[in-house]
């Protein structure tokens, strides 16, 4: 049994019990008393912001809202509905029980909605714009982090004056504890949306800015350690290279170095700010930290993204699981009597999908779900709002007419009443999971005289191939080097105070307003005028 499934099964019963208690506590209430003095974000006049604020305010007037002390936003990057369904079946089958009727921890949360993920300029958005919608309450252009649609892509000067306050920055100003966790680089789009303000999501280090003036725009890593986010209590993820000088060897991989061209070691600069800070890069260092103390922790466990869950145990220096990081963060942030705001991202679900590698996407979804179960166990349903959602979907499909119990990663095995049988019109078998586009459409067959790969893009025979192998890539229709995002609505699950506002079909940027109003950090629209 795979580690992610084992962790999930061990916590699922407890998560279901927690969710049962949550269902009672999340019932509509006429109480709207804020816990804090609301802070008006600088983006309050943005059209998208105002529209979402008004929509949430109407629901509050109709349903009421209980005040929350804490907020946890779980973002499964690229975790569309088909990913959730496939992961559910995979979890059950891996545990030796019925997969189709299995239930993930996230699915036990009592409130749910569909969230519309389009950006200001794209039907199918990227993670930067969608994450900004959830952390700052406005829709913006794809590729933008923490700036409004008034800016121009890659133009530093145009971004000046378009910056948005994030819920995490507002929470800090109000005295709450704050944290961000991701299995991706901590400067990547989704975690970066908690603090960064750039018109180009790829400006993760100064060396990435390519001609942009560092006097006008700061790279994302520099913003993390120089801005309000420098005082985040817990920062855990990957991406060390963006914080280390180009001449500095990586502490885990001596043959690799940092990526910064300015010679600055931003991790050392962060640690030197006061005596309460600890940096960490491996599992042993993580385990040695007393998260029940007032320590601030900055942990970056890989030069780039953290390992996929399927590969994590083989990591050279070892790294904690997403569940372990979540437990540590909640332990640390709960010390603040005023409450906390935390983001937890399962960032590598998305990367596996881009690679057309469904098994790693499913394994990382289950690791993400185990973190959700841990949060349900550790928090009080009466005072903690938990929202679980995705930033966008992917082109993963569950297709054919496979029989009940057919391995979700296997070939379609049709039953007697199935239309179309188990083979395609070309006489070849196909898998239940496939992608509309991506690298699985072609196979490298040879190299030309210059060493460039040659490809065969005809559908190949899967007979005798282990389609559940770790490196198997599901077949796809349109050949692309990287599979794309999907534009359909994504699921949002919620529990705790304010969860009753997560229902129906909502705009993605309304999630910010639900969180902000529940914890009392942002004012109602009437108070903004």
Question: What is each of the regions a protein language model found here?
Answer:
Residues 2, 19-63:
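Short glycine- and acidic-rich boundary segments immediately preceding or forming the N-terminal edge
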Residues 73-74, 180, 388:
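Structural beta-sheet core signal
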Residues 135-137, 169-175, 226-228, 378:
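Alpha-helix C-terminal capping segments
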Residues 163, 168, 173-193, 525-527:
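Glycine-rich phosphate/pyrophosphate-binding loops
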Residues 38-50, 64-69, 79-85, 89-132, ...:
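A post-motif C-terminal structural segment
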Residues 146-161:
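His/Cys-centered metal/cofactor-coordination and adjacent catalytic loops
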Residues 7-17:
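Bacterial N-terminal signal peptides
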Residues 1-7:
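N-terminal export and membrane-targeting signals
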């Amino acid at each position: 049994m795979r580690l992610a499934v084992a962790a999930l099964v061990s916590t699922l019963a407890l998560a279901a019990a927690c969710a049962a208690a949550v269902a009672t506590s999340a019932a509509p209430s006429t109480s709207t008393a804020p816990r804090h003095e609301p802070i008006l974000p600088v983006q309050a006049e943005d059209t998208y912001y105002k529209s979402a604020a008004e929509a949430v305010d109407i629901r509050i007037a109709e349903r009421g809202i209980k005040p929350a002390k804490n907020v946890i936003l779980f973002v499964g990057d690229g975790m569309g509905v088909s990913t959730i369904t496939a992961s559910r079946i995979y979890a059950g089958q891996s545990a030796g029980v019925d997969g189709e009727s299995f239930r993930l921890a996230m699915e036990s949360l009592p409130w749910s909605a569909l969230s519309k993920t389009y950006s200001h300029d794209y039907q199918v958005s990227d993670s930067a714009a969608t994450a900004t919608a959830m952390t700052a309450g406005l829709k913006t252009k794809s590729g933008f982090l923490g700036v409004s649609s008034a800016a121009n892509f890659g133009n530093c000067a145009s971004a000046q004056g378009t910056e948005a306050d994030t819920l995490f920055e507002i929470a800090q100003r109000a005295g709450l504890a704050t944290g961000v966790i991701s299995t991706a680089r901590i400067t990547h789009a989704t975690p970066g949306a908690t603090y960064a303000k750039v018109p180009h999501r790829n400006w993760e280090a100064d060396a990435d800015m390519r001609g942009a003036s560092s006097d006008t725009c700061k790279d994302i890593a520099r913003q993390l350690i120089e801005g309000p986010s420098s005082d985040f209590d817990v920062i855990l993820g990957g991406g060390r290279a963006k914080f280390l000088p180009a001449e500095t060897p990586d502490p885990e991989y001596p043959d690799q170095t940092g990526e910064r061209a300015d010679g600055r070691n931003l991790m050392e600069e962060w640690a030197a700010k006061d005596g309460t800070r600890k940096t960490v890069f491996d599992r042993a260092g993580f385990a040695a930290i007393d998260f029940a103390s007032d320590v601030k922790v900055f942990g970056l466990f890989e030069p780039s993204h953290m390992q996929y869950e399927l590969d994590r145990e083989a990591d050279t220096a070892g790294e904690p699981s997403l569940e372990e990081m979540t437990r540590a963060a909640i332990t640390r942030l709960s010390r603040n009597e005023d409450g906390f705001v935390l983001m937890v991202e399962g960032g590598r679900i998305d990367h596996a999908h881009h690679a057309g590698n469904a098994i790693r996407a499913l394994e990382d979804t289950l690791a993400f779900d185990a973190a959700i179960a841990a949060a349900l166990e550790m928090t009080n349903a009466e005072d903690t709002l938990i929202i679980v959602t995705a930033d966008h979907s992917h082109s993963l499909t569950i297709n054919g007419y496979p029989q009940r119990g057919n391995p979700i990663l296997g070939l379609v095995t049709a039953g007697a009443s199935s239309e179309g049988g188990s083979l395609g019109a070309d006489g070849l078998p196909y898998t239940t999971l496939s992608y509309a586009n991506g690298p699985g459409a072609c196979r490298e067959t040879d190299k030309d005289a210059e060493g460039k790969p040659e490809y065969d893009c005809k559908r190949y025979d899967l007979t005798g191939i282990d389609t559940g192998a770790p490196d198997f890539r599901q077949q796809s229709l349109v050949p692309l080097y990287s599979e794309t995002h999907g534009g359909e609505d994504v699921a949002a699950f919620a529990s705790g105070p304010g969860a009753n506002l997560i229902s129906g079909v909502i705009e993605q940027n309304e999630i910010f307003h639900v969180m902000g109003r529940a914890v009392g950090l942002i004012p109602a629209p009437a108070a903004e005028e």
